[in-house]
Amino acid sequence: MLDKNLLKTNSKEIREQLKSRSFNLDWYDEFLRLEKQLSTLLRTIEKLNEQKNINAKKAATTESDAQRKKLIQEGGLLRAELEKNEAKYNEIKEDFDYIYQRIPNLPTEDVPIGKDEKENVEMFKSRKPTFFDFKPLPHYELATKLEMIGLDVASKITGSRFSIYKKDGARLMRAIQQFCLYVNADKYEEYLPPVIVNKDSYYGSGQFPKFVEDVFKLEGTNYYLASTAEVQLVNLHRNEILKEADLPKYYTASTACFRSEAGSAGKDTKGLIRQHQFYKTELVKIVHPSTSKQEHEAMAKDAEKILELLELPYRRMVLCTGDMGFSATKTYDLEVWIPSENKYREISSISNCGDFQARRANIKFKDAISKKNLYVHTLNASALAHDRLFVAIVENYQQKDGSIKIPKALVKYFGKEYIK
């Protein structure tokens, strides 16, 4: 979340930034109005508490029974007035928090202004897209033909937007997982976290309460399936004060992820691009505020390194204000070339969240100079989405005879050079 004091300034710049994030400025005006009411009520409550304490001391020390009786009556009136104001405060605070918790992060100055993905800006392409002297098959046709996936049986077992990897398909997914972890193993500390998380964890990473409909809740419990390992890794240090000397911290985890894909009806209904259960390797950094910009650039290169080693065509996009995630202050997307669609598809998002998540999760460090406890900055990246990487390899490395060549860098993890 954002600093309340920053939001209270109601500057023209903040209004423009929120507008560029498609945030309703009427809500912002209501936030400011409620904040003033809360400040006034808080001063009243503090004054009433002070009067109540003075009254109680006088009642305890007076020797006059009549005076004591009068003071006790006054104390009762003060308590009643205090309870009334506290109830009013709590009522307004609930409305205030509802808005405050839904205000998105503010974009940095170099983020392009735009409404949606159509206004994202391409930074560069890595290499020429893959073209063939034959008509390439979409991944779901070729992988089914080679008995690598079972979409129909997954639908029978569970339902739509689920898949089963089998034989060389399961083997390729295992190789992808290992490769994604090992490429950055020298920099990031690996974790294997639970895929079930609580509400506080989702709140800390910024998904709740705004995106509560996008995740799976375990019926009859207060637990949820994690939509990304970012949730678990960001919350490793929730409610902690770190030593400045211990920064930065780099974490990685490879997990199954679960999303309800609410609002995605009709999108990518065939194949492995958009599923309820998918797999990815996540990177998370917890860093000193002064270094987060440089750490963001380095993190993008860490994700790109995987695509470079696999010799897959990709491009880097900087997301516009209207397409960035809720918690991000700046985001790069890596998009990999999908031959059957003749276009690039997202395979990684790399976001700098500034202190937005740290404020929600209450993650601080003790500054060595000022001795103050300050909020850290957090960053996250998919490195990479395994299912989409599977799609990219199958499609870009398909051969004229219907086989799939395994990228050189992946052969030692997969164990052979071709899938036939």
Swiss-Prot record:
Gene3D superfamilies: Bira Bifunctional Protein, Domain 2 (3.30.930.10), Serine-tRNA synthetase, tRNA binding domain (1.10.287.40)
GO molecular function: ATP binding; serine-tRNA ligase activity
Signal sequence coordinates: none
Keyword annotations from UniProtKB, A to Z: Aminoacyl-tRNA synthetase, ATP-binding, Cytoplasm, Ligase, Nucleotide-binding, Protein biosynthesis
UniProt-listed InterPro entries: aa-tRNA-synt_IIb, aa-tRNA-synth_II, aa-tRNA-synth_II/BPL/LPL, Ser-tRNA-ligase_type_1, Ser-tRNA-synth_1_N, SerRS_1_N_sf, SerRS_core, tRNA-bd_arm
Pathway in which the depicted protein is active: Aminoacyl-tRNA biosynthesis; selenocysteinyl-tRNA(Sec) biosynthesis; L-seryl-tRNA(Sec) from L-serine and tRNA(Sec): step 1/1
A single GO BP: selenocysteine biosynthetic process
GO CC field: cytoplasm
Keyword Nucleotide-binding in annotation: yes
Residues that hold ATP according to the record: 259-261, 346-349
EC code(s) of this entry: 6.1.1.11
Binding-site residues, L-serine: 228-230, 282, 382
Catalytic activity entry: tRNA(Ser) + L-serine + ATP = L-seryl-tRNA(Ser) + AMP + diphosphate + H(+); tRNA(Sec) + L-serine + ATP = L-seryl-tRNA(Sec) + AMP + diphosphate + H(+)
Keyword Protein biosynthesis: yes
Family annotation (SUPFAM superfamilies): Class II aaRS and biotin synthetases, tRNA-binding arm
Main location: cytoplasm
UniProt subcellular location: Cytoplasm
Similarity comment: Belongs to the class-II aminoacyl-tRNA synthetase family. Type-1 seryl-tRNA synthetase subfamily.
Alphabetical list of PANTHER family matching this protein: SERINE--TRNA LIGASE, SERYL-TRNA SYNTHETASE
Recorded domain comment: Consists of two distinct domains, a catalytic core and a N-terminal extension that is involved in tRNA binding.
Assembly with partners or alone: Homodimer. The tRNA molecule binds across the dimer.
Task of the protein: Catalyzes the attachment of serine to tRNA(Ser). Is also able to aminoacylate tRNA(Sec) with serine, to form the misacylated tRNA L-seryl-tRNA(Sec), which will be further converted into selenocysteinyl-tRNA(Sec).
Protein name (record): Serine--tRNA ligase
Organism of this sequence: Mycoplasmoides gallisepticum (strain R(low / passage 15 / clone 2)) (Mycoplasma gallisepticum)
Organism placement in taxonomy: Bacteria, Bacillati, Mycoplasmatota, Mycoplasmoidales, Mycoplasmoidaceae
